[in-house]
């Protein structure tokens, strides 16, 4: 059993070093907002997970009321992940978060078609799919769970008081997957974890989670210095090394100026930086 959290920009600035030391073993991160824009801290959170080798997955809180709307939401998620360098991989799971009241106003067949459309788009883009719901609407078949033989992540909060990361309720409260595999249980929305200000959702997952990877181009963002980028792609960033790289990339008289470093970062982002 792994102890983890799920987060969005509501958690604000996170100290990932403290989070890691607190025992967090995985993090599930919100991808996009209602208007399909990236969560404003998505890149920052992915960076933190990568730096401290915390396995991660993603979720999309769904609002779509039609299959076409679901495909639009899924495409926005895929585009966002590609933009930050989280390239398609079956080790990267995107969970459809189905809990909005407007969706539950749909009939079960209609909402099932919505979720199926989202799933198909995620899978066809090369990622893995999972379904997140609260226990009650899942069991009452707001979505026809018999059609989702997938990773199932269910929410059930037995207690309303603040909880520590490893204060997991006993298994008598654990929800059950009616179909597919119960991979995770969100057991509290009032978690207290070092490194996070305020409450955070607490989860336990069963089995292993892969440490996610991002492409080298992700590191060529304003959040990273050239030295950090070179370290991330396994190149020792001494001044002599950077001078050699500059020569190889036709950047003359390298002295480490901002302009020269930005040129290298641009080449790295485009996958054109020669490092030898």
Predicted regions and their residues:
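Short, Lys/Arg-enriched alpha-helical microdomains
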Residues: 241-273
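Substrate-binding cleft of extracellular glycoside hydrolase catalytic domains
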Residues: 1-119, 123-126
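Functionally critical loop-and-helix segments that line ligand-binding/catalytic clefts
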Residues: 1-9, 147-214
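Extracytoplasmic/periplasm-facing segments of secreted or lipoprotein envelope proteins
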Residues: 215-236
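Catalytic domains of cell-wall/extracellular-matrix polysaccharide-remodeling enzymes
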Residues: 88-171
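Low-complexity, Pro/Thr/Ser/Gly/Ala-rich linker/spacer regions in secreted
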Residues: 207-220, 272-276
């Amino acid at each position: 059993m792994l102890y983890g959290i799920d987060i969005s920009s509501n958690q604000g600035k996170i100290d990932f070093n403290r989070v890691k030391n607190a025992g967090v073993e995985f993090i599930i991160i919100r991808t996009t907002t209602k208007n399909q824009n990236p969560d404003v801290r998505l890149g920052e959170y992915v960076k933190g997970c990568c730096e401290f080798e915390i396995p991660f997955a993603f979720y999309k809180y769904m609002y779509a009321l039609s299959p076409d709307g679901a495909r639009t939401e899924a495409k926005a998620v895929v585009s966002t992940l590609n933009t930050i360098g989280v390239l398609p991989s079956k080790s990267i799971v995107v969970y459809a978060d189905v809990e909005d009241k407007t969706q539950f106003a749909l009939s079960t067949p209609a909402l099932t078609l919505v979720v199926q459309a989202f799933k198909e788009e995620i899978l066809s883009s090369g990622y893995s799919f999972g379904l997140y719901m609260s226990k009650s609407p899942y069991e009452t078949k707001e979505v026809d769970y018999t059609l989702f033989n997938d990773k199932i992540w269910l929410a059930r909060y037995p207690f309303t008081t603040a909880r520590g990361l490893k204060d997991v309720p006993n298994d008598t409260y654990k929800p059950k997957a009616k179909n597919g595999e119960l991979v995770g249980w969100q057991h509290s929305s009032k978690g207290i974890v070092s490194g996070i200000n305020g409450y955070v959702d607490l989860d336990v997952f069963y089995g292993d989670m892969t440490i996610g990877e991002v492409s080298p181009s992700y590191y060529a963002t304003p959040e990273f210095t050239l030295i950090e980028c070179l370290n991330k792609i396994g190149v020792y960033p001494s001044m002599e090394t950077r001078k050699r790289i500059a020569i190889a990339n036709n950047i003359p008289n390298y002295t480490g100026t901002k302009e020269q470093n930005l040129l290298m970062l641009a080449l790295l982002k485009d996958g054109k930086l020669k490092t030898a």
